[in-house]
Design a protein with these regions (language model features):
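Short hydrophobic beta-strand element within catalytic cores of glycosyltransferases
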Residues: 228-237
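Short N-terminal targeting/anchoring amphipathic segment
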Residues: 1, 58-78, 94, 209
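Donor nucleotide-sugar binding/catalytic pocket of nucleotide-sugar-dependent glycosyltransferases
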Residues: 94, 102, 113-148
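Conserved donor-binding/catalytic core segment of Leloir-type glycosyltransferases
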Residues: 148-169, 175-178
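A charged, aromatic-enriched C-terminal amphipathic alpha-helix characteristic of glycosyltransferases
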Residues: 5, 268-302
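Active-site proximal beta-strand in glycosyltransferases
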Residues: 67-72, 83-103, 118-121
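A short alpha->beta transition loop at the rim of the catalytic pocket in nucleotide-sugar-dependent
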Residues: 204, 224-228
Length: 305
């Protein structure tokens, strides 16, 4: 899978480290149609036809791989069969959870995780659902692709909000808050990734989401561009992240109830926006640099081989 470009970023970083890594997808992601090495292009209907393609792929790639790294709770063929086959073939398996695949689920519903050799979450906030995660490995960005432009001072700052899901990200609360403030608001939704990037590069302030306990890839990209980010954060996860990586989390934490209050200082102070934006870029370099993320994966792989 290649949700938010995660898988494609990972395999390219691993290849730069000398690892023979390939990304297999069932279908290309709509807004990232070129990001894959192997596209199964599964039939859109017909379970038996889909399974036939998936089983042929497993038969082809089983001899070629030492580790199968899966995403989002999905495996190449049904887990009840895929994992015993991997064990019988002496292949290792990793499951990387991405958020919606675990959020709100019980440990009993996620019991299948223990059948993998390792299971990963992307933030300490996610350990509320998977407290026994083998590792916490945050998403990575190739920072060579993210050069920030100098911030611009203006009377009406531009707030950008780019929800993948309007309801889940709390878009109505963002709209309501901005309506009470001297700002312009751009809600970026349902557009190709390249267009979304160009629009949030113009932002003075970025608001990520109001319902979850941690930020998403959009917030990471925004910080990489030097933008101050506002989102809902779990305080315990903030403390755990700062302890693990030795750096302050520079995101402004807000809820739907205090969003106006948290936005106002950033709106009033250009210098504060510059400072928080610079701290965000430094944070991403420390925690989300793709080369460092690849090193964390390589260390994990070595521990299970």
């Amino acid at each position: 899978m290649n949700l938010a470009g995660t898988g494609w970023a990972h395999v390219n970083a691993l290849r730069r480290k000398g690892v023979d890594a390939r990304l297999l997808v069932f279908w290309p992601q709509k807004w990232r149609p070129e990001e894959y090495d192997i596209n199964l292009d599964l039939p859109r209907s017909g379970l038996l036809r889909q399974q036939a393609v998936q089983w042929r792929a497993l038969a082809r790639y089983l001899p070629q791989a030492d580790i199968f790294h899966f995403y989002f709770g999905k495996t190449l063929v049904p887990k009840s069969l895929n994992l015993p086959i991997l064990r019988a073939a002496r292949k290792k398996s990793v499951m990387q959870f991405l958020g919606d695949d675990i959020r709100g689920k019980t440990l009993h519903e996620l019991e299948y995780r223990k059948k993998f050799d390792a299971w990963i979450v992307g933030s300490y906030a996610a350990t509320r659902w998977v407290p026994d995660a083998t590792a916490v490995i945050p998403p990575g960005l190739d920072l060579r692709d993210y050069e920030s432009d100098p911030p611009v001072e203006r009377d009406r700052p531009l707030v950008v909000h780019a929800p993948s899901d309007l309801e889940k990200k709390g878009t109505r609360h963002v709209i309501a808050a901005c309506a009470q403030l001297p700002v312009d608001l751009d809600v970026v939704h349902g557009v190709p990734h390249e267009e979304a990037v160009e629009r949030f590069k113009r932002a003075d302030i970025v608001v990520d989401q109001m319902h979850y306990h941690w930020h998403g890839v959009f917030a990471i990209e925004s910080m990489a561009y030097g933008k101050p980010v506002v989102t809902h954060l779990d305080p315990q996860a903030v403390a755990q992240t700062e302890e693990a990586f030795g750096v302050k989390v520079p995101i402004v934490s807000a809820t739907k109830d205090d969003l106006v209050e948290k936005l106002r200082p950033l709106i009033d102070s250009f210098e504060l926006r510059k400072r928080v934006g610079a701290e965000g870029r430094a944070y991403v370099e420390r925690v989300h640099d793709l080369d460092k993320v690849a090193d964390r994966f390589i260390e994990l792989y070595a521990s299970i081989l």
